[in-house]
Amino acid sequence: MTTYDTQPSTLIRNAAAIMTGGRGTADDPSRVPGPDIRIVGDTIDAIGALAPRPGETIVDATDCVIYPAWVNTHHHLFQSLLKGEPAGLDATLTPWLAATPYRFRALFDERRFRLAARIGLIELARSGCATVADHNYVYYPGMPFDSSAILFEEAEKLGLRFVLLRGGATQTRQLEADLPTALRPETLDAYVADIERLAARYHDASPRAMRRVVMAPTTVLYSISPREMRETAAVARRLGLRMHSHLSETVGYQDSAYSMYGKSPVAFCGEHDWLGSDVWYAHLVKVDADEIALLAQTGTGVAHCPQSNGRLGSGICPVREMADAGVPVSIGVDGAASNEAADMISEVHMTWLAQRARLGMLAQPAYRGGSFEGGAGAASIAEVIHWGTAGGARVMGLDEVGKVAVGYAADIAVYRLDDPRYFGLHDPAIGPVASGGRPSVMALFSAGKRVVVDDLIEGVDIKELGGEARRVVRELLREVVV
């Protein structure tokens, strides 16, 4: 008896283009001709010109383009109810933290937290994202609900892969000093004990896991002590967990590292066991050439978050230089309180443009010694797709996720380019990244299951969800300390 006889089979037929998530090399192509893909169980079984088999489900992808489902490597889902908060709208990182996420965080009870998580996950799924890594730092001593369990539950309801980046802090900065008791730090023992609990309950080390747990102190430079950095790294590696945190999001990280430790943030992390192929950092906007070389040498990855970095005015991560040096690159949406377009299509569109603009800013006229006109070669569409799919899977160790290739997990986004913004494209394959906006998701498959059908998710009433969100925002505005 064949696998086909025992597992459900789906044939996606007649796609206009198939992007693979590959690097664009001869042995790792960025696109394949197809035009068909067969899914058997949770696996991509075949790609090519395929004949239907008796009894299998047929999905007509005529005029559609197919991508690997996006892999989002850094988010803060609880912030889905903090979009466009006026006090932080025009603030840089530090005053924004005090004005928005820290000011409102204590108001998130179980109901509000669950709603925020649901909104964020649905927003991501409807952009073609099937793997979400959430850097959750809503934890405090005596907390009356389990925020980690809620995140896993909501992701499972939608059929998405979920990686919990278990944040937290054992010490606070001055900006947190006068905030509510729900922002109290944890002890290191309590933090480690919860990591061990979560790992035992949820962590799956397999290469296409639906659930993972990651050791992720909120900010290694500020949230834990140098001694605790080494201790948390040792615990993570003992448990077989990866490691993640924020780093070098602004110049403030450089100032702090040099003033406190006399070295760069990346070098400091290296001296405290927080570099390696099992580590990736969000942002890394402000890094120098020596730091990039150290990241590459150790295999430490980056979650590039261009929209949040732009919204907060932090700068643009030097992704081109990182990729050229061999740093593993991925893409993250970051929290919606600093990125109101909290979906992966918006993020990859911005990645494509921002990297080109950054390189173009370095161009000089010939009389000043300039040798190039602009930065259009800084990021190709194929590279951006790779960073947002296979690149993300790589930094999280999901080795059978993130590519449209035979034998990989069947995480597939099928986009219908039926909006005028896509009309006139000479190469429809580039539409979702190059044209921006949110294309209609005709189908999103996660582990072989169709979780989005023509932009709809079974059991989700978007109108009702929007009404509930507006009610909770009004509640938050009434209760927050001005």
Curated annotation (Swiss-Prot):
Binds 1 zinc ion per subunit. Its cofactor is Zn(2+). Zn(2+) binds at residues 74, 76, 246, 283, 334. It catalyses: a 2-amino-4-hydroxypteridine + H2O + H(+) = a 2,4-dihydroxypteridine + NH4(+). Substrate binds at residues 79, 249, 283. Pfam families: Amidohydro_1. Disulfide bonds: none annotated. One of its GO terms (molecular function) is pterin deaminase activity. Its EC number is 3.5.4.11. Keywords: Hydrolase, Metal-binding, Zinc. Belongs to the metallo-dependent hydrolases superfamily. ATZ/TRZ family. NCBIfam families: PRK12393.1 (NF009059). This is Isoxanthopterin deaminase.
